[in-house]
Amino acid sequence: IRRQRQMCIRDRFRLNNQNRGSGNKESLWVLQYDYLNPGSNTDYNASFSFIPYYQNIKITAKNEAGEEVNTTAFLGVTDGKCGRGIGWIQPTSHFFNDIWSKGSENDIRNSEYNIIRDVRIDNPESPAFGQWLVKDGYYKQLDSIRQWYPLMTKISRVNNFPEEFYQKDANGNPLMTPFGEHLVINSANGSYKDVYLFRLAETYLLRAEAYVNKGDQAKAAADVNTVRSRANADPAQPAEVNIDYILDERLRELYCEELRMLTLCRMGKLADRNRRYNPRTGMSIEDYHNLWPIPYSEIERNVYATIEQNPGY
């Protein structure tokens, strides 16, 4: 049963399975991408932004003579590590750790297939070849802001990139790492598949939010548990389902999908959640940042009405 649920979670994001025409009854609105059709949206550069800048990682390890040797950890960008990223968007520790603790220890959305938390060092010239970047402690040498954090596979075609993006030798044969991953070119930084804008799971969570605002936690929990049961997560208890719980559940279900800032602003939780969970922006964010300033040009254009600027600007 666990494997069936695992495949159900993964299937939602595999190639050619986002649209209702493919039998996916969860999709509501899907953005269409065709990288081979210049008349279409050709790419969704999620990997470029969300995946860390791992390809230039350098580590120091001792060789057989006991000498410290500094080399790159990886041969380059690979399809097994979600393509080329530059680490523009790094999720918080709250996402990578906190939300998967109580009641979500067995949550398939956090499985090693959906969030890759460790990878093997694949450069044969490194004394650390074959060891694990995290388990064996090499990640401690790195810039954890951009160079390394877990890989979120839903945004990419992991181990299934279009062949046009493979690196090849002089005879046209694909180049691979010793561990079977295809080396890909630097422009391999997209999803190369259609992308959900809305799907049914979010609808359940929206209705759960409405029930919470009405004070009906039992119905809110029922909707939340419709989503959680598929992921093999423990059921939420009505007493614990509040707006913060729903925001955490949206993280678990919709990470790398929803426009998170819009959700937080809509709920009036932007400043609060940043102060609690984001050590970088939390130090400087103010309550008034929940609304953006109205452009002065728009205020000027409305000659028949007085438009007040949003507070704080």
Predicted segments with their positions:
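Long, intrinsically disordered, low-complexity segments
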Residues: 2, 10-75, 164-168, 172-197, ...
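Flexible, polar/acidic helix-loop-strand segments at domain edges
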Residues: 65, 72-199
